[in-house]
Amino acid sequence: MKYENIGSRLLMAASLVCGGKTVCDVGCDHGKLSLYLVKSGKAEKIIATDINKMPLQKAIDLFAEHNISDKAQFYLTDGLQGLSETDDITHVVICGLGGDTIAQIIHNAPFIKENGVQLVLLPAQSGDKVRQFLYENGYTITAEHTVGENKKFYTAISAQYTGETVQHNTYDCYIGKTENCTGADAKGYFEMVLTRHEKKAKGLQIDTGSCPEDITEAIEKVKKLIQSN
């Protein structure tokens, strides 16, 4: 396997890792992103975790195949559990998990706040839950990028704890800084968000006879983003 062949999603996540000394890849799956980060010079060392034994072993085998096992530590654990004493982590990367799960992993790891760890997050779904958690718990979103892969669209989020909470609405939770993104992937992402909200609005109209202004405003703003792309 060529380490470069990791797909557009993981490449986008990797692009947000800057100056990584020790990068923790949570839910590392088969270790492809971890390997790429080391091989490309984006990480000096990797801590790879997974809750399942088989994918973690695949990651171990992949690093051995490339003769860089000395560049990584592997942990069979849930999220970041057991890593609180590892105070040299500079980045935590979480890709491919649901938004609620990502939020819970961050919540359960206070060292992220204490040590100024950079977060790189790419939820498989429910990105709104990730943004909401970050807004309400003092994390500042520093960058977001949209990315498409296999006809699905995602957002990659870079964030760091500052202690500053952010007032937010439906639009902020579902769009965030992606409103600054342009191109085909951005348009695909915005269209996905619009479809979901129009469906939600229709359901609310049927069930309650009305739709909250917050949602209708979000729909109109997203339509404008699509038109500009």
Predicted features and spans:
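Conserved SAM-binding motif I beta-strand of class I
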Residues: 45-50
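Conserved alpha-helix/loop element of class I SAM-dependent methyltransferases that forms part
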Residues: 4-20
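Class I S-adenosyl-L-methionine
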Residues: 2-6, 91, 100-229
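Glycine-rich SAM-binding Motif I of class I
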Residues: 31, 35
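Conserved SAM/SAH-binding beta-strand->alpha-helix loop
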Residues: 52-54
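S-adenosyl-L-methionine
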Residues: 60-86
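Conserved class I S-adenosyl-L-methionine
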Residues: 20-29
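Short SAM/SAH-binding signature in class I
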Residues: 88-96
